[in-house]
Amino acid sequence: MAKQSMIQRELKRERLISKYSAKRQLLKEELKTVSSYNDKLAIYKKLEKLPRNSSPNRHRNRCWATGRSRAYYRDFGLSRHVLREMAHEGLIPGLTKSSW
């Protein structure tokens, strides 16, 4: 199980991403339309002033059951350990363990 502080940090990042996404998108669109170098620098400065954790690149997917960040399966929102256990128990609809 991941530390609670790490899980809370990721939740904080998700909140910041959703809060600043419109502003960040607007600045990036403006950056594409502007042609002068000085204007681009000014827009980059505005982007840099946004909180660092509001960037979607800093978000890390985590398993909703354990908080584990590695070996994460997007389709299920689970890490490989939990996915395997739940598949064995038949808790994931439509998923069966193969055997031959």
Swiss-Prot record:
GO molecular function, one term: structural constituent of ribosome
Gene3D superfamilies in UniProt: 1.10.287.1480
Source taxon at top rank: Eukaryota
The keyword Ribosomal protein appears for this protein: yes
Metal-binding listed as a keyword: no
Compartmental location: Plastid, Chloroplast
Family designation: Belongs to the universal ribosomal protein uS14 family.
Protein name: Small ribosomal subunit protein uS14c
